[in-house]
């Protein structure tokens, strides 16, 4: 209707009086809806290293194990993003605790069967001039098999325990002896990291001065019911009476002291005569299986086991017993 009126007016107008007709404004085509792809799941965040709370806090232990055994880290096999992220977490934590790097940095690189990786090593220098050159090692391997094998108990639990022990030592009085905290790569490939470190010790940490090795490997098995083996702590060794005394303070766990072990990172230094205590819980169902996940571990028992290991570390670092003479006499007891 409106179009017909406009045409009639245009026909009646003179040349000088023609009505100016504006073109019709074009109608914009409809904008197609924007399809937004769902956001990818957030990557796990490295737990903050700034905490001054209790070192054996259950929530912190669980947070660290959950992170280390996350699907994103995929089992922390050597030369993977999970391996590199794990080493960064450990090195950052050592840095925040004020540990001295064993080399130019905390990471000491080595080749794991053609795969570049690293051990992560920091230490607290002893405070007593008479025994400061003697060394207590606390070790745990940080790698696992990868490819869907997440390694919560083996050995995210040991790494979480080692970091807790390092915090406990740092929060206490300076130890008389030097305490080294070392996490190893390539353990699942044949203890490659610990053998490399034993063959190439940092200049500041000679093997001849190591008087005790404390190893944390698989300390969180959910069905161990509070049982932990403390292998290597034979009756004649200096660690045994100290461990027995500590164990009585933790009635909720059963510390099975004594016995010999094989197949973990204490082995290279044991072959050089260094005594060891190897904390371990059995895990027959999920050992090296995909069911070794963070949701099935016993964090309360893990906290107690880590606390026993921490107390042993501190007592061994401060004991008046002649640990160098004990090593010379008994070696690692095998």
Protein language model regions, located:
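His/Asp/Glu-rich mid-to-C-terminal helical/loop segments that flank catalytic regions of hydrolases
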Residues: 285-334
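Extracytoplasmic/secreted proteins, especially bacterial periplasmic and envelope-associated proteins
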Residues: 56, 60-63, 67, 81-93, ...
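A non-catalytic alpha/beta surface segment that caps or lines the substrate-entry region
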Residues: 76-125
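Metal-dependent peptidase/peptidase-like ectodomains
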Residues: 174, 184-283, 298
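Short, low-complexity, disordered segments immediately C-terminal to signal peptides
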Residues: 16-35
């Amino acid at each position: 209707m409106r179009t017909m009126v406009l045409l009639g007016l245009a026909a009646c107008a003179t040349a000088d009086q023609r009505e100016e007709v504006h073109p019709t404004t074009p109608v914009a085509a409809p904008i197609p809806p924007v399809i937004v792809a769902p956001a990818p799941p957030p990557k796990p965040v490295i737990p903050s290293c700034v905490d001054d709370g209790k070192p054996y806090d259950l929530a912190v232990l669980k947070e660290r194990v959950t992170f280390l055994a996350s699907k994103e880290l995929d089992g922390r096999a050597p030369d993977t993003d999970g391996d590199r992220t794990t080493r960064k977490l450990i090195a950052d934590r050592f840095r925040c605790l004020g540990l001295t790097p064993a080399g130019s940095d905390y990471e000491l690189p080595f080749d794991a069967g053609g795969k570049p990786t690293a051990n992560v090593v920091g230490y607290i220098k002893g405070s007593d001039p008479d025994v400061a050159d003697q060394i207590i090692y606390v070790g745990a391997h940080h790698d696992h098999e990868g490819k869907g094998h997440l390694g919560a108990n083996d050995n995210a639990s040991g790494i979480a325990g080692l970091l807790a022990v390092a915090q406990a030592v740092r929060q206490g009085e300076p130890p008389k002896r030097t305490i080294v905290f070392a996490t190893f790569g390539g353990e699942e490939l044949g203890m490659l990291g610990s053998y490399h470190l034993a063959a190439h010790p940092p200049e500041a940490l000679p093997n001849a001065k190591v008087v005790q090795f404390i190893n944390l490997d698989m300390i969180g098995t959910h069905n161990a019911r509070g049982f932990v083996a403390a292998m290597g702590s034979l009756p004649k060794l200096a660690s045994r009476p100290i461990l027995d005394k500590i164990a009585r303070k933790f009635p909720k766990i059963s510390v099975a002291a004594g016995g010999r072990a094989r197949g973990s990172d204490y082995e290279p230094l044991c072959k050089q005569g260094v005594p060891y205590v190897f904390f371990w819980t059995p895990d027959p169902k999920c050992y090296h299986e995909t069911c070794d996940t963070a949701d099935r571990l016993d964090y309360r028992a893990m906290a107690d086991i880590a606390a026993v290991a921490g107390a042993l570390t501190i007592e061994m670092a401060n004991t008046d017993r002649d640990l160098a003479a004990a090593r010379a006499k008994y070696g690692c007891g095998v």
